[in-house]
């Protein structure tokens, strides 16, 4: 029988989670939708990886929160949704990822390449057979935001600022610059830029936790 530990996440209204994915425990990096990220799989996460590779290749990631000193760089009015699991504070807003590739090395280490899919809210953690899984709901962005004139102005300003930054920092990949220029969705644009910017860990967790697209610009 699965052992269930319900986690209350405030501010998201009534939820009826119908989806679950193996829980991948990690601190960093912060993964955003659309991004491709390599990860080292430690012993703690190996069972979760094996389980998902036999199914749909989906993993749920809720980043570990940094200490209070690092969180102190965030604006005072910010309140992060969080929960405690295995004596660690974790963000209540995480990311659903798909495993694109698994690589096994001669030294026994395992690395995976994952693609960020959607922001998700954690509703509960369940453990069955020693493998934790997260019950979650997908954070849906309001369609009206895509038609908002003010939001489109923010998009234009963000693209211009990113182009200026890319000109001063040659290390930004050309394919990322092309993706930013052609991003039709304000949410996708904000996430592409957030992933590319050299922000600290706490700031990236804050951006991941923002389900209102307008706040990300």
Task: For each feature predicted by the language model, list its residue ranges.
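N-terminal low-complexity, acidic/polar interaction/targeting segments
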Residues: 2-217
